[in-house]
Amino acid sequence: MDGESSLERYLDQCDAEDVLASSAHMYTPMTPYDDLAIQPLPGTSYSSALEQSKELSTDFSSVDLSFLPDDLNQENEDQQEQQTSSQSLEQDSGICLDASNLSQPFTPSECRDASQDSTNLCPMPITPMTPMTPMTPVAESSGIVPQLQNIVSTVNLACKLDLKKIALHARNAEYNPKRFAAVIMRIREPRTTALIFSSGKMVCTGAKSEEQSRLAARKYARVVQKLGFPAKFLDFKIQNMVGSCDVRFPIRLEGLVLTHQQFSSYEPELFPGLIYRMVKPRIVLLIFVSGKVVLTGAKERSEIYEAFENIYPILKGFKKTT
């Protein structure tokens, strides 16, 4: 009996301890796992184990990578070479890329400022489609003034003309309708020639200046008036001016046509001169080996002078050295 009673008391005591333990777990507030203190087992040190794990995580020099395929090792080496080359290239060019700036989006104002800066730094010129005369820097003026040799002008007499009557009664006039359908009339001062058509149109050639051309045309109109025709003097206009000059040195035309083949043509078997068609001003030049130059196609005297000043430094570059 005493043994049974002592056994029962022992069991009751154990049950009471279990109830207290369970109630303590139920009513105690929960704490985060980080606040729980780690109770090391006797005979072990966690600090040394943590330090050893850190060393293992950071140091891979002793790890054997022989089991990896060669392709992966080659790719890693290529990536490292690209990174080092890009870094060295940035250092050489003075460009530094900031990852924080790249991650931030640009604002519209910044984009607009960047576009304006780029247009200011790198303007794109609009080149014309038509060929332009090559511009050669003129170091000094040529000192040569082309002389006008011929001026062609036209005028309208504004009346119908009887060419046979004009040829019979006017001096220094000839008319051959089988050869040319106009009266050819000449005067001595200024020394010019006129072509008079039955429609009343007249062409005056041979004058050496603009004033001489106008004066000669008026004299021809006066002759026609004296023959009984109601001639007027309308729409006088200079159609062509011809000038010439000498640069006083021989020119290598073969080299000139090769360099400026877009503007020039040279066929010595057909014509001994090089034909150079200038775009601005619109003048045609005949250039000869001797250095003589003929300029034609101008409407004004200034175009003759401008064309020669443009072509002179080019001719100087192809001067023959004997």
Curated annotation (Swiss-Prot):
Compartments in which it is found: Nucleus
Source organism superkingdom: Eukaryota
PROSITE patterns, per the entry: TFIID
One example GO MF annotation: DNA-binding transcription factor activity
Claim: Transcription is one of the keywords in the record: yes
Primary location recorded for the protein, binned into one broad class: nucleus
Pfam families referenced in this protein's UniProt entry, alphabetically: TBP (PF00352)
Protein family: Belongs to the TBP family.
HAMAP family: TATA_bind_prot_arch (MF_00408)
Protein name: TATA box-binding protein-like 2
Species of provenance: Xenopus tropicalis (Western clawed frog)
